[in-house]
A protein has these predicted regions:
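A mature extracytoplasmic/lumenal domain signature
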Residues: 15-17, 50, 96
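Small/polar beta-strand repeat architecture
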Residues: 16-31
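Glycine- and acidic/polar-rich repeat regions and solenoidal domains
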Residues: 34, 56-72, 85-404
Length: 463
């Protein structure tokens, strides 16, 4: 299949290298598949539809975000069991409404993009961006593929939603677009969003959480064969919880945030991180859209607990990427200053315990030597009867290691937001359910599996 796009030309136009009279040719001009014309058409269920071949337009976070299907700034939609494919840009949009400041950075670039984005956040807070009127959608069991920009996109409008058991693949694999909005799932302001048990593979990127993913939880997802990172968390202050995931691409995680809890994951690729002291980014009151403050991303304030790292021959595998960060038990090394730039080179301390590094993955020097073992591990992803499986062979040392159960009390609070790592309803949690839904006890294994296993289904059941 070949894609070719063209605005309505004044004269006939032919795709290069193709005779449209000698092959199947389809022209898509429909901008939406299932998308209300008006805002606030809330509490609609869409189940079992095939939505395909939609000529969707670009969906940036600073303008109206169209999609093949979406609620258009509403509350409480259920999109379940649908097939969404061959959308020029985005499959499912949970994104931003039309706004008087749409694309203002392109129209008048005298203010930077981060500043105009911040203004858009405040203008929508003044109008109706709150938990009672927008968001809270349930997106489950959908098959989304062959989209040019994103499988699921959403700025502000995805807050308080659940995205579960979806299979998303082949997103932007043709490279028809470049820029900062391409991913299987790309969300801004993913406040209290639960992203659970999805399979995201063979895309330009797996999951990208950008700005204000406060209270989000990423749990029991599988990623493989993604071109850049499986997971990118950008300029978020935390708390963000990432637990029991399988990161199997060459690059597992890009961390340009702070206050992230990485617990009981399998990382089979590189990890990279850096602060961002070039722009002020916002944090919120717990479980709310209301802004509590704004500050730089200094880096650190992470909790890296009970993960399994399998090296892939690259240098940045394992917890050693945190070398130079202070241990949280040493406290925050700061003196009082009213100048945010005074701390630009002073990262927050981190809490790193209970991890196991294999296959050349290297430990952070603050961890005991036993957390790094020379033993080899092997894994592969195969397809069987239309479903994907992980084959995993771990050495005996992986089953000899022990780790403690992680709870809300263990994780504490993120520094800037002063918000706890907890359920979206504000109740405490225990990260005691592994990738296969087995329960953990007080002493458990590092990594995503509470019991030894060698054959793991990645495709959600029923998909």
């Amino acid at each position: 299949m070949r894609w070719w796009g063209r605005s309505a030309p004044p004269s006939p136009s032919t795709p290069p290298g193709v005779n449209p009279n000698a092959c199947l040719t389809e022209c898509s001009v429909r901008p939406f598949g299932f998308f209300p014309r008006e805002e606030k058409r809330s509490f609609i269920t869409v189940r079992g539809l095939i939505i395909e071949k939609i000529a969707t337009q670009w969906a940036p976070p600073t303008a109206f975000q169209p999609g093949a299907i979406g609620p258009n700034w509403a509350r409480g939609w259920v999109i379940e069991g649908c097939t969404v494919r061959d959308s020029k840009c985005t499959g499912i949009s949970l994104g931003k409404r039309r706004d008087e400041k749409d694309n203002i950075w392109s129209i008048d670039p005298t203010k930077g993009g981060a500043q105009t984005y911040t203004e858009i956040i405040f203008s929508n807070l003044r109008r109706d961006w709150n938990k009672n009127e927008v968001g809270g959608h349930h997106i489950e069991g959908n098959h989304i593929y062959n989209c040019g920009q994103a499988g699921i996109v959403g700025c502000m409008g995805a807050a308080f939603s659940t995205i579960a058991r979806n299979v998303i693949h082949d997103i932007n694999v043709r490279g028809e677009f470049t820029g900062a909005e391409m991913s299987a799932i790309k969300l801004h302001c993913a406040i209290d969003v639960a992203i659970e048990h999805n399979l995201l593979f063979r895309s330009v990127r797996g999951l990208w959480l950008d700005w204000e993913a406060q209270g989000a939880r990423v749990t029991r997802n599988a990623f493989f064969e993604n071109q850049t990172e499986d997971l990118f968390i950008e300029v978020c202050h935390g708390p963000t919880t990432v637990d029991h995931n399988l990161f199997l691409s060459c690059r597992s995680f890009l961390n340009v945030s702070q206050g992230t809890a990485l617990v009981h994951n399998l990382f089979a690729g590189e990890i990279s991180m850096h602060p961002d002291t070039s722009r002020f980014t916002m944090y919120h009151f717990p479980h709310d859209t209301f802004i509590a403050g704004s500050i730089f991303i200094y880096g650190g304030d992470d909790r890296v607990l009970n993960n399994l790292f399998i090296g892939n021959g690259q240098e940045n595998c394992g917890t050693a990427v945190y070398e130079g960060y202070r241990d949280a038990e040493q406290g925050v090394a700061r003196t009082t200053s009213d100048c945010p730039t005074a701390y630009a080179d002073n990262t927050f301390p981190v809490h790193i315990r209970g991890n196991l590094c294999l296959n050349g993955a290297r430990r952070w020097s603050g961890e005991p030597e036993s957390s790094q073992q020379p033993d080899a591990a092997a894994w592969s992803v195969t397809e069987e009867n239309g479903a994907f499986y992980l084959g995993l062979q771990l050495p005996a040392s992986a089953y000899a290691a022990t780790a403690s159960l992680v709870t809300t009390e263990t994780l504490g609070k993120a520094f800037e937001s002063e918000a706890a790592y907890e359920n979206t309803d504000g109740t405490p949690f225990a990260l005691d359910t592994d990738y296969n839904c087995n329960k953990r006890s007080g002493s458990t294994l590092p990594g995503p599996f509470a019991v030894p296993t060698t054959h793991i289904r990645l495709t959600p059941e029923g998909m």
